[in-house]
Amino acid sequence: MKLIIFTGLILFPIVSLIEAQAKNEKACLPQYQVCTDAPGNCCSNLICDCYGRYKNGARIGRNCFCLQKGVLYKKEN
């Protein structure tokens, strides 16, 4: 019985450490990927840039994409 409790006490911190490392090492989102639900997950050289969508002057939604820092995007005709 003591061996089971001791084993559990040893395994719990090891499993917790592995899970914490996996969360810290999650893959970042590359350029042009949607980041609406995960704004902090863009790779280090990118930012999550959001744009509102409008129809007849009323806002109908929002789109966010991982884009290069410092780059301006303009609508082309």
UniProtKB/Swiss-Prot annotation:
Keywords: Disulfide bond, Secreted, Signal, Toxin. The keyword Disulfide bond applies. It is found in: Secreted. Residues 21-26 form a propeptide. Residues 1-20 form the signal peptide. One of its GO terms (molecular function) is toxin activity. Contains 4 disulfide bonds. Expressed by the venom gland. Belongs to the neurotoxin 19 (CSTX) family. 08 (U8-Lctx) subfamily. This is U8-lycotoxin-Ls1k. The lineage of its organism: Eukaryota, Metazoa, Ecdysozoa, Arthropoda, Chelicerata.
